[in-house]
Amino acid sequence: MDELTAQALKAFTTRYCDAWQEKHGSWPLSEELYGVPSPCIISSTRDAVYWQPQPFEGEENVNAVERAFDIMVQPALHAFYTTQFAGDMPAQFADEKLTLLQTWSQDDFRRVQENLIGHLVTQKRLKLPPTLFIATQENELEVISVCNLSGEVIKETLGTRNRTVLAATLAEFLTQLNPLL
């Protein structure tokens, strides 16, 4: 596992939870994740859950993605998706507002791998270099991804060659993220 990425993700998650605690006096609250089982759930309200990050349980890799395409996935991506279970976290990188995607549970991890495979299928069909997404943006056609060839974090427009490099590594990207509440 890429320890720098794992440490940077944990540090950002701590910054996010601390900012939430300071603003709201509680652990993060999510309406979107209400009713979805997870080891992260601390308590529930009538229509939302309070969550706390938990250590990832299970095989710490995205080998299903590697097997589906007979490729080696960047070590940073293995770390990103298997360091912890947590809720998605709104954040800002420079001028880019985004939602950092996280795995909520073991079932969610399987779904994420299936979505990553689907993303790669589309890229292969369009003859685009392989990327694996890590965050969404308000414009649903734009995502933040890691280029599987270079390891760079990029902003890309889905289905096109429009790509902008944001950071040289995933650890660097995570270190520069700021919580957005």
From Swiss-Prot:
Q: Any keyword Cytoplasm? A: no
Compartments in which it is found: Cell inner membrane
Q: Which domain of life is it from?
A: Bacteria
Keyword annotations from UniProtKB, A to Z: Cell inner membrane, Cell membrane, Membrane
Predominant location of this chain?
membrane
CC per GO annotation: cytoplasmic side of plasma membrane
* A Pfam cross-reference name: Syd
Membrane-protein topology: Peripheral membrane protein
**Is the Cell membrane keyword given for this protein?**
yes
Which family is this protein grouped under? Belongs to the Syd family.
- Sum up the protein's function in the record's words: Interacts with the SecY protein in vivo. May bind preferentially to an uncomplexed state of SecY, thus functioning either as a chelating agent for excess SecY in the cell or as a regulatory factor that negatively controls the translocase function.
Q: What is this protein called?
A: Protein Syd
Recorded source organism is Salmonella typhimurium (strain LT2 / SGSC1412 / ATCC 700720)
**Organism lineage:** Bacteria, Pseudomonadati, Pseudomonadota, Gammaproteobacteria, Enterobacterales
Q: Which gene produces this protein?
A: syd
